[in-house]
């Protein structure tokens, strides 16, 4: 499934930096500081692992970006840098924070506001602040989230492929369910299925009563006939994530399992129907929660019931801006992407979660995947 995958173009990345500069101007930010991570990849296409050594980019409101790299990594950095040629190295005994402060000075930023990308680690931020104390340091989420929350058609196409891959991997893994299987064996099978399709993916899976734990149990499990199987998996395509959960029964479902599964599906449908342009994020959560409460569960986050938000944003990170949760008055706009995953948790018995991701269009929400038709048919 690797054929036909189109990476994000350099022109699109330049457009992202231009949008960041416009948002910086609106928020009176003179430069943006980012370290290695998904936002750096978003703007530049650079993939770089985090360590104690700083690799960073400064994106000024005016002018090309500047990069800070360990001296011995300069050649590797140059392999990936495609925007701007201001590459500054620091040797092992030198201060990278002083190098960043030098960029601010050289770009004429002696006073003003520096936006810190929200995932920057404290020791990096603190080091920069001490070297350039005359500057004000502010949260740059208005810039980064302002860019990343709205996906382009190219991004949505990559997310579509990631979802297609995970569904196929799920199908292959479910075909191998067997009595006595452990979660570790299921995880290995699912990883191998993703790999066979050309991508790296992983899964969380729980059986029976342990399916009630939203993020799983650490206790030993072995699959038995009649067990609920709750599996939550995803993969990345050019960095863009899928996130899908399916719940089925190994064997013949009981009336109770079928009843709870059907309530969960109605809650997922209610959230999807509510996810219209201009609706608030909290109204989507409320729609799903009402179905579960009306069925006699909850209320609020009480269990048996729905113990967590209805969904989260998704893109380059499996969880990103913004959440479908009570109190979030952000309005849905075309290009936003979310998971739709209310859950019905009944500790001591089982849990059911159905998760499909959706993207918002002018005409309403669209699912990346076909929803589960029934507890007997996990794949549409």
Where would I find each of the regions flagged by the language model?
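Active-site neighborhoods and metal-handling regions in enzymes and metal-associated proteins
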Residues: 1-380
């Amino acid at each position: 499934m690797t054929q036909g995958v189109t990476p994000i173009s350099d022109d699109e990345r330049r457009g992202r930096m231009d949008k960041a500069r416009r948002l910086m101007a609106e928020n009176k930010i003179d430069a943006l500081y980012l370290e290695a991570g998904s936002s750096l990849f978003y703007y530049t296409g650079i993939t770089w692992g985090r360590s104690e050594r700083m690799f960073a980019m400064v994106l000024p409101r005016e002018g090309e970006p500047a990069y800070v790299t360990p001296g011995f990594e300069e050649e590797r950095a140059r392999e990936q840098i495609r925007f701007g040629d201001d590459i500054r190295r620091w040797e092992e005994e030198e201060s990278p924070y002083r190098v960043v402060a030098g960029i601010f000075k050289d770009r004429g930023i002696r006073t003003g506001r520096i936006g810190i990308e929200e995932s920057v680690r404290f020791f990096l931020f603190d080091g920069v602040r001490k070297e350039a104390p005359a500057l004000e340091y502010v949260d740059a989420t208005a810039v980064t989230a302002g860019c990343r929350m709205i996906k382009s058609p190219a991004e949505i196409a990559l997310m579509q492929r990631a979802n297609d891959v995970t569904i196929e991997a799920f199908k292959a893994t479910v075909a191998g369910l067997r009595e006595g299987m452990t979660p570790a064996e299921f995880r290995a099978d699912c990883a191998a299925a993703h790999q066979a399709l050309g991508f790296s993916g992983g899964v969380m899976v729980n059986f029976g009563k342990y399916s009630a734990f939203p993020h799983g149990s650490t206790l030993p499990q072995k699959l038995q006939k009649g067990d609920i199987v709750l599996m939550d998996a995803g993969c990345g395509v050019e960095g863009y994530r899928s996130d899908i959960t399916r719940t089925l029964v190994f064997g013949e479902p009981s009336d109770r399992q079928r009843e709870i599964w059907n309530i969960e599906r109605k809650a997922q449908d209610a959230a999807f129907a509510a996810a219209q342009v201009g609706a608030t994020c909290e109204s989507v959560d409320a729609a799903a929660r009402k179905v579960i409460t009306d069925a006699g569960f909850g209320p609020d986050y009480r269990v048996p019931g729905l113990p967590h938000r209805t969904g989260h944003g998704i893109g380059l990170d499996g969880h990103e801006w913004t959440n479908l949760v009570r109190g979030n008055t952000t309005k849905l706009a075309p290009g936003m992407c979310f998971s739709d995953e209310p859950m019905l948790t009944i500790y001591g018995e089982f849990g059911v979660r159905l998760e499909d991701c959706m993207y918002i269009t002018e005409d309403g929400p669209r699912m990346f995947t076909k929803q589960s038709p029934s507890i007997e048919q996990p794949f549409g």
